[in-house]
């Protein structure tokens, strides 16, 4: 915490009116090409912030989509069976909406939920029609969309949205179990009315977490650190997803490649990727260190970007084949996504190994299992 206190002192002029340094000091437009679009000053600030962390600090983060929350509610009555892979269907619908981002449908989620299902049906009909322009590239997608459309036609238009706050805490509980952390306290940034328990606190308790409290970030430096890191991850992730999202229906039948601007890095910008890579991918490794729902593409792409950037020894190595780096990243990211899909084919739950001693570990029911 002393290192973070030094960071706040050094950049005291960047504090907001509450006396905090927020991730809002980095505007979203500055992430257009990831860290390649950072100016020298922002590179220095982020470098100093990432230097606060070391290999002994535990971090956990969850990546989720509001679209996925809604899709899970619509299809809550659909379970996996020999006739239908409900999880794959939910994933495919979420991916389609995230990838193509149809504005009217996204808008209806918040403004007119009753129109959402009909809009969804029309969207898939339109996509099937457009995909016929490039059947070789879009054949599998078209088959999936036709199956989805058949299911959507059987669903009632009655829809009520209730946002669910449990998923991030479910992942956090799994992380604690995996790392064997029993002695902990969880302070949640207070939201809503001062005298009333927040929905996030209730969700954490319902998941089964203990030692819970709510606090103000002005009083807890740990909350400020977590808020800053979460904001940076979220903005870098959004910049990446925006770059890979189709901007018009006309271009949606072509392959989407990460813009060359992402790879026009200097050494200091490349070093930011390497620092973030070690923090997220190397230090305190764990299966549940990062967590997502059925739709995990964004998280996989994010981790792929960090791994891809980290493998370069210098910017000269990038520049030697600059025009092809987008294609290379696309191939690498697709390989990681395929590995994820292969794991999803196995519906058996993955249980992390919790060491008990050098000869044994505890399973999820507390039983002692020898290696």
Language model: regions and residue ranges:
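Charge-dense, low-complexity intrinsically disordered regions
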Residues: 53-371
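A structural signal for well-ordered alpha-helical scaffolds and beta->alpha junctions
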Residues: 42-43, 222
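Charged/polar, low-hydrophobicity segments characteristic of intrinsically disordered regions
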Residues: 16-39, 260-282
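An N-terminal structural lobe/cap that precedes and organizes the functional/catalytic core
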Residues: 1-38, 44-62, 367-371
């Amino acid at each position: 915490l002393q290192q973070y206190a030094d960071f706040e002192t050094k950049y005291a002029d960047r504090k907001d009116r509450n006396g905090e340094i927020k991730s809002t000091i980095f505007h979203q437009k500055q992430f257009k090409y990831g860290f390649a679009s950072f100016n020298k000053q922002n590179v220095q600030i982020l470098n100093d912030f990432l230097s606060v962390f070391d290999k002994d600090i535990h971090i956990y983060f969850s990546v989720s989509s509001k679209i996925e929350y809604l899709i899970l509610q619509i299809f809550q009555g659909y379970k996996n069976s020999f006739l239908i892979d409900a999880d794959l269907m939910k994933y495919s619908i979420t991916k389609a909406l995230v990838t193509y981002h149809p504005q009217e449908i996204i808008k209806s989620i918040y403004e007119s939920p009753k129109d959402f299902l009909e809009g969804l049906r029309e969207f898939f009909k339109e996509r099937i029609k457009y995909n016929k322009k490039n059947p070789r590239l879009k054949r599998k997608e078209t088959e999936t969309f036709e199956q989805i459309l058949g299911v959507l036609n059987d669903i009632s238009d009655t829809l009520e949205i209730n946002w669910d706050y449990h998923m991030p805490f479910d992942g956090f509980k799994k992380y604690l179990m995996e790392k064997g952390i029993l002695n902990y306290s969880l302070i949640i940034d207070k939201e809503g009315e001062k005298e009333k328990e927040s929905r996030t606190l209730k969700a954490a308790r319902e998941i089964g977490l203990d030692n819970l409290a709510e606090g103000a970030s002005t009083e807890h430096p740990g909350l400020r650190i977590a808020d800053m890191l979460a904001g940076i991850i979220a903005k870098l992730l959004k910049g990446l997803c925006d770059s890979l999202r189709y901007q018009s229906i006309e271009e949606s039948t072509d392959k989407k490649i990460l813009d060359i601007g992402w790879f026009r890095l200097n050494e200091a910008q490349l070093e930011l990727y390497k620092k973030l890579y070690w923090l997220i991918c190397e230090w305190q490794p764990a299966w549940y260190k990062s967590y997502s729902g059925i739709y995990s593409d964004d998280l996989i792409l994010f981790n792929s970007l960090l791994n891809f950037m980290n493998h370069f020894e210098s910017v000269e190595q990038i520049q030697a084949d600059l025009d092809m780096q987008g294609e290379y990243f696309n191939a690498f990211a697709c390989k990681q996504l395929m590995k994820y899909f292969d794991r999803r084919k196995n519906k058996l739950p993955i249980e992390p190994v919790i060491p008990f001693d050098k000869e044994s570990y505890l399973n999820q029911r507390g039983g002692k299992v020898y290696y």
